[in-house]
Amino acid sequence: MAISVGDTAPDFTLKTQDEQEWKLSDHQGKNVVLLWYPLDWSPTCEGENCKISAEPLPGGDTVVVGISRDSTWSHKAWKASKGIKHDLLADPMLEVTKKFGLEHPAVPFISHRATVVVDKSGKVAYCGVQESTGDERDWGPIHEALGKLG
C-alpha cells in the first residue's frame, strides 16, 4: 500500500547520477517532489523529466528529484543526453520504492509512475500513482499541492 497524505515520509539515502549521496532529511525546510518513473530512456519518462526541467514546479523552496531502478551510470548518461536539470536517484533494488509502497505489482522489477510531495516538515502533502506506466502523470494536483504549501 502506498504512503498516505499526512504520513511522515520515510527518510532514505540514495546515490545521484554523480555518485553523491542524496538524503531526504537533508532537505527538511524545503518542499521536496519525489518523481518515481519506471525506466530511463523510455518515451514517457523522458517527456516528463524534460518537461520538469523546462517548466519548473511552483515554489522557490522546492527540490525535485527523479527516482528509478536504473543505475547511476544510466542516469548520468540520460541526464546529460536529454538536458535534465534535476538530480536522478538510483534505487536499483527498489528498497526506497518499497518503503513508500510504490513497487509495481504486475511488473515487480520497476516502480509505479508516482509522485510524492514532502512538505518542509517531512510530512507527505500529496501522493499520486499512475496505474498505467505508459500514461504521463497528472501535473495539476502536484501544482495544487505545492501552491497550498507555499
Residue ranges and their predicted role:
Residues 1-150:
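Chalcogenol-based redox active-site neighborhoods
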